[in-house]
Amino acid sequence: SNTKAADIAYYGAGMAYLHLNQYQDAIAYLNEFSASDDLLGALAKGALGDAYAELESYDKAMASYQAAIAHADNEFSTPIYLKKAALLAYQTNDFSKAKSFAETLKERFPDSPESVNIDGLIGLASK
C-alpha cells in the first residue's frame, strides 16, 4: 500500500504520460495508483481505459471504463465513461453493448454534456 503522497505522484505521472502519448508509461504509473478518493479513482481507471484504447487493447480499455463507471457513481465522471464505453463498443462492432451504455447515459444523466447527441449513437447502434 502506498502513502497518500506516493499515490498522488503515481496519478500525476500517469496522467502526464497519458497526455504525452506515452501510453505504456501511463499504464504503469496508473496501475500503481490506489485511490482513497472515489472520484480520483474513477478518473484514474478511466485514464487507463484511454491509454489501453490508444494501444488498441480494446478489451482492457472496456474493462477499465466499466471499472471507472462502477468505482464512483456520480454526475461528473459516470457520464464521461458511459459515453466512452458506448463509443468503444460501437467502434468494436458490439452494437448491443454500445446501445446499452448509450441508453443508460441518456436515462440516468439526461442533462449531462455527454448526453448531447446521444440519440444519434443509439440510432446507429440500433441498425
Feature-to-residue mapping (PLM):
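Short solvent-exposed coil/turn linkers within tandem alpha-helical repeat scaffolds
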Residues: 1-6, 20, 34-42, 70-77, ...
